[in-house]
Amino acid sequence: MAFGSLSSLGFGSGVLTQDTIDKLKEAEQKARIDPYTKKIEENTTKQKDLTEIKTKLLSFQTAVSSLADATVFAKRKVVGSISDNPPASLTVNSGVALQSMNINVTQLAQKDVYQSKGLANDGGFVNAQLNGTADLTFFSNGKEYTVTVDKNTTYRDLADKINEASGGEIVAKIVNTGEKGTPYRLTLTSKETGEDSAISFYAGKKDSNGKYQKDINAEKIFDDLGWGLDVSASIDPDKDKKGYGIKDASLHIQTAQNAEFTLDGIKMFRSSNTVTDLGVGMTLTLNKTGEINFDVQQDFEGVTKAMQDLVDAYNDLVTNLNAATDYNSETGTKGTLQGISEVNSIRSSILADLFDSQVVDGTTEDANGNKVNTKVMLSMQDFGLSLNDAGTLSFDSSKFEQKVKEDPDSTESFFSNITKYEDINHTGEVIKTGSLSKYLNSNGGNTNGLEFKPGDFTIVFNNQTYDLSKNSDGTNFKLTGKTEEELLQNLANHINSKGIEGLKVKVESYNQNNVTGFRLNFSGDGSSDFSIKGDANILKELGLSDVNITSKPIEGKGIFSKLKATLQEMTGKDGSITKYDESLTNDIKSLNTSKDSTQAMIDTRYDTMANQWLQYESILNKLNQQLNTVTNMINAANNSNN
């Protein structure tokens, strides 16, 4: 606050000036404000250095977490006998069983492809003389698609109608081949590969009674396209779910076919060149005919890299810890966090866990060189990790990989101590009462029941595929029952009879919110991936769908699991480092508040002091003026008397 300029304490004494007040204020600020400023700067520096340490600590924690996670040991790599342009490729997910396989591809899956005869104009009419309409029916994958044309329908319109009716399952296009005179052709291509995707034709459609009726106008349209139907075969479209082929084989330019290959000598057939049902987490892609061997191996590269990341992160952390906690006895200088127990204990806590010895289940060789199960004591020194004189870690990757290869199971147990898996507990959707009545034999007579074709319903567990289309004696399985509960129980019994170790199926009753029915429940020990595959419609009737459940290991207390917990005690919400950081923040906030209030008090005091002395000086100036007036009067009187 400004009150004017205070020059001196009246009468020219010069005792109290503004400069004197400023010096008094500066001295008090130095005594009372500077300690706050210094402490705030010290805490801010501590917090900055602590933030750097926390960042390094979190990087180290990330490296530890990856080694505490058992999935790092489940990583796999595939080594193929042919690397350039192989006949097949294999990819696998983590956890797939280590194995070798021989694949011999003898035939690739193909789509079905037809082309019409040459057309002069892509916008020409299919049949300009057509009276009324004509119905053309196409079949593929057991489904039928009927399109209706009239005299105004062009070839492009026909292609669009086929695409729309089939929902893209049959792809129709008008292509320009460049042929003279008739450069355009209508082509049909099945969306998917495989024999079941084969396209067939019927000149007509199904009537209101469900009977197929021929249409001579449709026959003419097919003939005009070059697709005259070969009706010599005995075909029942309703029963066979397919129509006729064409007479002109030259216009059937590619025939739908399944892929054929052998897996370790076993003949296999698939509708696609991408095979995903050989085992959970495995995808085989067929590229061309030929033979190739695959070896699924443990991927040590990922574990080795994780170890090196751990070492690098720790050494980076130690560099920051040394700078922040160092003390030089000769110079007396010390790091900003020297003497802070929460920080000083970081290194010792980490090393205590990291180099702790632990007894785990492992193997050893007996006198005859045979491996026998036993308890073994391990430490990180056994895996190539050591602490050098500088206090940093060193890592011998070759020693590490050799030790892991010797006994991967004991390594996994030592690192993360995974001893069990989450149980599998999968329950299907509700099968509402009455939804399976068409398969029942309620009167004790014959019944069609529900038959599964190969691949309609399969279960994959412990890397084995179980096809439910067959009984244990190899005969075809038919699902029957007098009641829906009995029918479903027969299904559960059939699955359980497969002897799938670790997996059980049961039927559960359901009665909630006025909905009654049953559900199928699958339970297991969770040590293997579990999947259900098959025909979507059949599975849906049974309250199921394609599903893949990956086994989930439960984390134990191996070396890195324990170290992970220790680090969490430092960096977690209630961790020691977190709490210390919060205390610094609170201290800085409190110090700033005290500093501001003290500064305000000092400012008020010296503003008041300056104001008071200005008032004193004003009074003294008035008195001085009065004194001068009296003095002048006296002097004037004296002069007049003289």
UniProtKB/Swiss-Prot annotation:
* Superkingdom of this protein's organism: Bacteria
InterPro entries listed in its UniProt record? Flagellin_hook_IN_motif, FliD, FliD_C, FliD_N
Q: Which residues form a coiled coil?
A: 614-641
Q: Which is one Gene Ontology cellular component term of this protein?
A: bacterial-type flagellum hook
Main subcellular localisation:
secreted
Q: Which GO terms describe its biological process?
A: bacterial-type flagellum-dependent cell motility; cell adhesion
Pfam families given in the database record? Flagellin_IN (PF07196), FliD_C (PF07195), FliD_N (PF02465)
Query: Which UniProt key words apply to this protein?
Result: Bacterial flagellum, Coiled coil, Secreted
- Please state where this protein is localized: Secreted; Bacterial flagellum
Q: How does it assemble?
A: Homopentamer.
**Record's function text:** Required for the morphogenesis and for the elongation of the flagellar filament by facilitating polymerization of the flagellin monomers at the tip of growing filament. Forms a capping structure, which prevents flagellin subunits (transported through the central channel of the flagellum) from leaking out without polymerization at the distal end.
The family annotation for this protein states: Belongs to the FliD family.
* Protein name (database record): Flagellar hook-associated protein 2
